[in-house]
Amino acid sequence: MVEKHLLEFLEKLQFLISKNVKISHYGIENVKKICGVDIAYKGNLGFSVGVSMDINSGDYNYKSYVGEVNFPYIPGFLFMREAPLMIKAIEGLDCHLLLVDGHGIAHPRKSGIAAVIGVLLDFPTIGVAKSRLTGDLVNESEITYVYLNGEKVGVKFGRYFYSPGNKVDLQDCIELGKRGYPKVLKIADMLTKKIKKE
Protein backbone atom coordinates (compact mmCIF):
# COMPACT_ATOMS: atom_id res chain seq x y z
CA MET A 1 0.00 0.00 0.00
CA VAL A 2 1.40 3.36 -1.06
CA GLU A 3 0.14 6.47 0.70
CA LYS A 4 -1.92 8.88 -1.39
CA HIS A 5 0.39 11.80 -0.62
CA LEU A 6 3.37 9.88 -2.05
CA LEU A 7 1.54 9.15 -5.31
CA GLU A 8 0.53 12.81 -5.56
CA PHE A 9 4.16 13.79 -5.06
CA LEU A 10 5.28 11.31 -7.73
CA GLU A 11 2.68 12.70 -10.14
CA LYS A 12 4.17 16.18 -9.68
CA LEU A 13 7.59 14.71 -10.38
CA GLN A 14 6.28 13.06 -13.54
CA PHE A 15 4.77 16.32 -14.79
CA LEU A 16 8.16 17.97 -14.23
CA ILE A 17 9.88 15.17 -16.18
CA SER A 18 7.37 15.53 -19.04
CA LYS A 19 8.12 19.26 -19.32
CA ASN A 20 11.79 18.39 -19.83
CA VAL A 21 11.24 15.77 -22.55
CA LYS A 22 12.77 16.91 -25.85
CA ILE A 23 10.94 15.72 -28.96
CA SER A 24 13.24 15.96 -31.98
CA HIS A 25 14.01 13.77 -34.98
CA TYR A 26 16.98 11.48 -34.37
CA GLY A 27 17.08 9.35 -37.51
CA ILE A 28 17.02 5.60 -36.86
CA GLU A 29 19.18 5.13 -39.96
CA ASN A 30 22.01 6.94 -38.12
CA VAL A 31 22.08 4.41 -35.27
CA LYS A 32 25.14 2.16 -35.39
CA LYS A 33 24.92 0.81 -31.84
CA ILE A 34 21.61 0.32 -30.10
CA CYS A 35 20.90 -0.55 -26.46
CA GLY A 36 17.95 -2.33 -24.94
CA VAL A 37 17.08 -2.75 -21.28
CA ASP A 38 14.63 -5.09 -19.56
CA ILE A 39 13.96 -6.52 -16.14
CA ALA A 40 12.62 -9.75 -14.63
CA TYR A 41 11.58 -10.53 -11.07
CA LYS A 42 11.93 -13.30 -8.53
CA GLY A 43 10.11 -12.36 -5.36
CA ASN A 44 11.26 -8.86 -4.41
CA LEU A 45 14.49 -9.12 -6.42
CA GLY A 46 14.76 -7.38 -9.78
CA PHE A 47 17.16 -8.73 -12.43
CA SER A 48 17.91 -5.99 -14.96
CA VAL A 49 19.96 -6.45 -18.12
CA GLY A 50 21.26 -3.80 -20.49
CA VAL A 51 22.39 -4.94 -23.94
CA SER A 52 24.51 -2.98 -26.43
CA MET A 53 24.26 -4.35 -29.98
CA ASP A 54 26.07 -3.46 -33.20
CA ILE A 55 23.34 -2.90 -35.80
CA ASN A 56 25.42 -4.20 -38.72
CA SER A 57 27.11 -7.26 -37.24
CA GLY A 58 24.56 -8.20 -34.58
CA ASP A 59 27.40 -8.61 -32.06
CA TYR A 60 26.43 -7.61 -28.55
CA ASN A 61 27.66 -7.30 -25.01
CA TYR A 62 25.65 -6.84 -21.86
CA LYS A 63 25.65 -5.80 -18.23
CA SER A 64 23.36 -7.00 -15.48
CA TYR A 65 22.34 -5.58 -12.16
CA VAL A 66 20.39 -7.26 -9.37
CA GLY A 67 18.66 -5.31 -6.63
CA GLU A 68 15.81 -5.38 -4.19
CA VAL A 69 12.51 -3.84 -5.31
CA ASN A 70 10.20 -2.60 -2.58
CA PHE A 71 7.84 -0.31 -4.51
CA PRO A 72 4.64 -2.12 -5.58
CA TYR A 73 3.46 -2.40 -9.18
CA ILE A 74 1.09 0.52 -9.80
CA PRO A 75 0.11 1.30 -13.42
CA GLY A 76 1.58 4.67 -14.38
CA PHE A 77 4.34 4.50 -11.75
CA LEU A 78 6.49 1.71 -13.19
CA PHE A 79 9.56 3.95 -13.09
CA MET A 80 9.67 3.69 -9.29
CA ARG A 81 10.11 -0.08 -9.50
CA GLU A 82 12.31 -0.42 -12.53
CA ALA A 83 14.18 2.78 -13.48
CA PRO A 84 16.85 2.60 -10.71
CA LEU A 85 17.82 -0.96 -11.68
CA MET A 86 17.63 -0.28 -15.42
CA ILE A 87 19.91 2.75 -15.12
CA LYS A 88 22.49 0.67 -13.22
CA ALA A 89 22.33 -2.04 -15.89
CA ILE A 90 23.09 0.34 -18.77
CA GLU A 91 25.86 2.33 -17.07
CA GLY A 92 28.96 2.28 -19.25
CA LEU A 93 27.33 0.60 -22.26
CA ASP A 94 28.19 2.09 -25.64
CA CYS A 95 25.19 3.03 -27.78
CA HIS A 96 23.47 5.84 -29.67
CA LEU A 97 19.84 5.00 -28.83
CA LEU A 98 18.29 3.23 -25.85
CA LEU A 99 15.13 1.11 -26.13
CA VAL A 100 13.29 0.64 -22.85
CA ASP A 101 10.79 -2.12 -22.11
CA GLY A 102 7.92 0.23 -21.18
CA HIS A 103 6.25 3.42 -22.36
CA GLY A 104 7.64 6.82 -23.26
CA ILE A 105 5.18 9.72 -23.57
CA ALA A 106 2.24 7.36 -24.27
CA HIS A 107 1.47 7.72 -20.57
CA PRO A 108 -1.28 9.60 -18.67
CA ARG A 109 1.25 12.25 -17.59
CA LYS A 110 3.48 11.82 -20.68
CA SER A 111 6.15 10.49 -18.36
CA GLY A 112 6.56 6.74 -18.82
CA ILE A 113 9.72 4.95 -17.78
CA ALA A 114 11.45 5.57 -21.14
CA ALA A 115 10.81 9.31 -20.75
CA VAL A 116 12.04 9.30 -17.14
CA ILE A 117 15.26 7.46 -18.00
CA GLY A 118 15.79 9.58 -21.13
CA VAL A 119 15.44 12.87 -19.25
CA LEU A 120 17.53 11.74 -16.26
CA LEU A 121 20.37 10.56 -18.53
CA ASP A 122 19.83 13.26 -21.18
CA PHE A 123 19.85 10.49 -23.79
CA PRO A 124 17.74 9.41 -26.80
CA THR A 125 15.19 6.80 -25.71
CA ILE A 126 12.17 5.02 -27.17
CA GLY A 127 9.65 3.08 -25.12
CA VAL A 128 8.54 -0.29 -26.48
CA ALA A 129 5.62 -1.74 -24.53
CA LYS A 130 3.53 -4.87 -24.80
CA SER A 131 0.22 -3.25 -23.82
CA ARG A 132 -1.50 0.12 -24.07
CA LEU A 133 -1.52 2.20 -20.89
CA THR A 134 -3.59 5.16 -22.08
CA GLY A 135 -5.00 6.94 -25.11
CA ASP A 136 -7.13 5.96 -28.09
CA LEU A 137 -6.08 3.99 -31.15
CA VAL A 138 -6.70 5.68 -34.51
CA ASN A 139 -5.80 4.24 -37.93
CA GLU A 140 -4.39 6.76 -40.39
CA SER A 141 -2.67 5.91 -43.68
CA GLU A 142 -2.11 2.28 -42.65
CA ILE A 143 -0.48 3.28 -39.34
CA THR A 144 -2.16 2.88 -35.95
CA TYR A 145 -1.49 5.90 -33.75
CA VAL A 146 -2.02 6.32 -30.02
CA TYR A 147 -3.82 9.61 -29.37
CA LEU A 148 -3.89 11.28 -25.96
CA ASN A 149 -5.95 14.45 -25.57
CA GLY A 150 -5.89 14.99 -29.33
CA GLU A 151 -2.12 14.53 -29.65
CA LYS A 152 -0.25 11.64 -31.27
CA VAL A 153 1.93 10.14 -28.55
CA GLY A 154 2.75 6.72 -29.95
CA VAL A 155 2.26 4.09 -32.63
CA LYS A 156 1.27 0.43 -32.63
CA PHE A 157 2.91 -2.19 -34.82
CA GLY A 158 1.75 -5.77 -34.39
CA ARG A 159 1.05 -6.15 -30.69
CA TYR A 160 3.69 -3.65 -29.56
CA PHE A 161 3.45 0.04 -28.71
CA TYR A 162 6.27 2.46 -29.53
CA SER A 163 6.48 5.96 -28.09
CA PRO A 164 9.15 8.66 -27.84
CA GLY A 165 11.03 8.78 -24.55
CA ASN A 166 13.46 11.64 -25.11
CA LYS A 167 15.43 13.23 -27.97
CA VAL A 168 13.50 11.28 -30.63
CA ASP A 169 10.16 11.80 -32.39
CA LEU A 170 7.17 9.81 -33.62
CA GLN A 171 8.77 9.27 -37.02
CA ASP A 172 11.68 7.53 -35.30
CA CYS A 173 9.17 5.27 -33.54
CA ILE A 174 7.47 4.50 -36.87
CA GLU A 175 10.78 3.62 -38.52
CA LEU A 176 11.69 1.38 -35.59
CA GLY A 177 8.27 -0.28 -35.46
CA LYS A 178 8.29 -1.10 -39.18
CA ARG A 179 11.35 -3.28 -38.60
CA GLY A 180 9.52 -5.58 -36.19
CA TYR A 181 10.09 -6.13 -32.50
CA PRO A 182 13.70 -5.05 -31.81
CA LYS A 183 16.23 -7.87 -31.58
CA VAL A 184 18.14 -6.05 -28.83
CA LEU A 185 15.05 -6.22 -26.58
CA LYS A 186 14.56 -9.91 -27.38
CA ILE A 187 18.13 -10.52 -26.22
CA ALA A 188 17.65 -8.42 -23.07
CA ASP A 189 14.45 -10.34 -22.25
CA MET A 190 16.18 -13.69 -22.78
CA LEU A 191 19.12 -12.70 -20.58
CA THR A 192 16.97 -11.40 -17.71
CA LYS A 193 15.15 -14.74 -17.59
CA LYS A 194 18.42 -16.67 -17.78
CA ILE A 195 20.08 -14.67 -15.01
CA LYS A 196 16.97 -14.95 -12.84
CA LYS A 197 17.25 -18.75 -12.97
CA GLU A 198 20.94 -18.85 -12.03
Swiss-Prot record:
Its cofactor is Mg(2+). It is an enzyme of class 3 (hydrolase). Its main location: cytoplasm. Gene3D superfamilies: archaeoglobus fulgidus dsm 4304 superfamily (3.30.2170.10). GO terms for biological process: DNA repair. Signal peptide: none annotated. Keywords: Cytoplasm, DNA damage, DNA repair, Endonuclease, Hydrolase, Magnesium, Metal-binding, Nuclease. The record marks 73 as: Interaction with target DNA. It catalyses: Endonucleolytic cleavage at apurinic or apyrimidinic sites to products with a 5'-phosphate. The keyword rRNA-binding does not apply. CDD domains: Endonuclease_V. It is found in: Cytoplasm. Pfam families: Endonuclease_5. GO terms for molecular function: deoxyribonuclease V activity; magnesium ion binding; RNA endonuclease activity, producing 5'-phosphomonoesters; single-stranded RNA binding. The keyword DNA repair applies. Mg(2+) binds at residues 38, 101. Its EC number is 3.1.21.7. One of its GO terms (cellular component) is cytoplasm. Belongs to the endonuclease V family. DNA repair enzyme involved in the repair of deaminated bases. Selectively cleaves double-stranded DNA at the second phosphodiester bond 3' to a deoxyinosine leaving behind the intact lesion on the nicked DNA. This is Endonuclease V.
